[in-house]
């Protein structure tokens, strides 16, 4: 028999705020309360994807010496001016030239390299050339790549593979970086079980928080997932307090809606402040955006597609902001709708789209719009944002698709 609940026991949404307003408001509040991220020094070889805390300048030049850029012979360029096929020149080893390989030191009096394919061997001590070279031709001078004292990477730069190579070439072995923002993740719900547990009716595998773990890593954070907690006010409260103490921000999975056992809003209000409860997006409306002890605490809906869009629109920019990174927009393509698409009118809707190229143009087809259909995200090539207060789009209409992955032509 269904439980009869007094309406006063249910949560009420404070307000369904427009997405842009909600994001702007919450990020401003987050930034105002943010302290400078902690720093640490790490080996350059282990800093891929980490953000620099300060500018890094080269300690040495690269190359550190004048180096041969080719296999061949090093020569005195001014002494072979004018040689050609009609007037070749025979050179003597140790007097006029030395054999060199790529990377070998070029020392005085030599100042150019003739490529080995332009050298004819006469005997063990002599070669003939019929092609001149310019001063310093085929020589990498000191500092051609990096000059000692040169800026290699600025502060707040997310280090890439090529940056690591340049740092090492510039004599840098360690670099000061911002510690990765630590994000605590609390799965809630009596029905939640870990992946691999024996399944029974009424139980749901916790996949959302594993998705959060992966996304946090992708955006430069360090996830700290806790064991699932049941729908018990005191237990969830203790879990939140522990997570807030141990992390830079906290995500609470499920419990953000208006049910009698959705405790997230009440707990955030008790322990801190609720800035926003309810955003005018579909899926993702029940999002809770708050602060406890000055740290961002975000209540994320339990439906997986809702969870993804709340994460992308709120959690992602908070993580990026903690390390001074830009929230770069996804690439957008123009595509023609394959069929009519009706709007919800009340909300900005994120419609998952399948895209392909037909007859020289992109065509987009909407996938299942349910908030619980994870496979609509897996199969989607992109997202169509359908603004609120419009009736939708007609078949054949051109729309903007935000790409989640490259589209096969």
Segments (PLM) and residue ranges:
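Flexible glycine/proline-rich
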Residues: 20-23, 35-44, 49, 54, ...
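Structural motif
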Residues: 73, 89-90, 98, 111-113, ...
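Short Gly/Thr/Asp-enriched flexible loops that form oxyanion-binding sites at enzyme active sites
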Residues: 259-271
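Short glycine-rich anion-binding loops that position phosphate/pyrophosphate groups of nucleotides
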Residues: 190-191, 255-259, 302
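Phosphate-interaction motifs
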Residues: 2-173
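Phosphate-binding glycine-rich loops and their immediate beta-loop-alpha structural context
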Residues: 141-252
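Short glycine-rich, flexible loops that bind phosphorylated cofactors or substrates
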Residues: 107, 161, 258-260, 306, ...
């Amino acid at each position: 028999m269904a439980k009869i609940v007094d309406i006063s026991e249910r949560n009420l949404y404070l307000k369904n705020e427009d997405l842009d307003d909600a994001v702007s408001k919450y990020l401003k509040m987050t930034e105002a309360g943010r302290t400078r991220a902690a720093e640490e020094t790490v080996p350059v070889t282990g800093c891929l994807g980490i953000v620099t805390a300060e500018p890094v300048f080269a300690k040495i030049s690269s190359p550190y010496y004048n180096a041969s850029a080719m296999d061949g012979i090093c020569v005195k360029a001014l002494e072979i001016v004018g040689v050609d096929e009609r007037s070749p020149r025979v050179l003597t080893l140790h007097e006029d030239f030395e054999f060199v390989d790529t990377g070998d030191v070029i020392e005085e009096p030599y100042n150019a390299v003739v490529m080995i394919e332009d050298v004819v061997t006469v005997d063990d001590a002599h070669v003939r050339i019929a092609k001149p070279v310019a001063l310093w031709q085929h020589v990498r001078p000191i500092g051609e790549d990096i000059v000692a004292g040169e800026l290699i990477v600025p502060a707040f730069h997310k280090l890439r593979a090529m940056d690591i190579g340049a740092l090492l070439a510039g004599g840098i072995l360690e670099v000061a970086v911002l510690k990765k923002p630590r994000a605590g993740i609390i799965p809630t719900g009596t029905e939640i079980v870990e992946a691999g547990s024996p399944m029974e009716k009424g139980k749901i595998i916790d996949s959302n928080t594993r998705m959060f773990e992966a996304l946090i890593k992708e955006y430069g954070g360090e996830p700290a997932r806790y064991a699932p907690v049941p729908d018990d006010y005191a237990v969830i409260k203790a879990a939140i307090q522990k997570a807030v103490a141990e992390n830079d921000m906290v995500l609470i999975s499920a419990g953000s809606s208006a049910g009698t056992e959705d405790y997230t809003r009440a707990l955030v209000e008790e322990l801190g402040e609720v800035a926003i409860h309810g955003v005018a997006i579909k899926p993702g409306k029940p999002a809770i955006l708050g602060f406890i002890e000055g740290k961002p605490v975000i209540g994320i809906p339990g439906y997986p597609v809702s969870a993804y869009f709340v994460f992308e629109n709120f959690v992602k920019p908070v993580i990026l902001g903690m390390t001074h990174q830009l929230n770069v927009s996804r690439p957008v393509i123009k595509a023609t709708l394959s069929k009519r698409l009706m709007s919800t009118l009340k909300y900005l809707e994120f419609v998952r789209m399948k895209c392909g190229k037909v007859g020289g143009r992109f065509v987009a087809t909407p996938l299942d719009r349910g908030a619980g259909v994870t496979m609509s995200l897996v199969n989607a090539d992109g997202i169509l944002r359908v603004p609120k207060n419009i009736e939708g789009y007609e078949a054949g209409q051109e729309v903007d698709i935000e790409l989640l992955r490259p589209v096969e032509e």
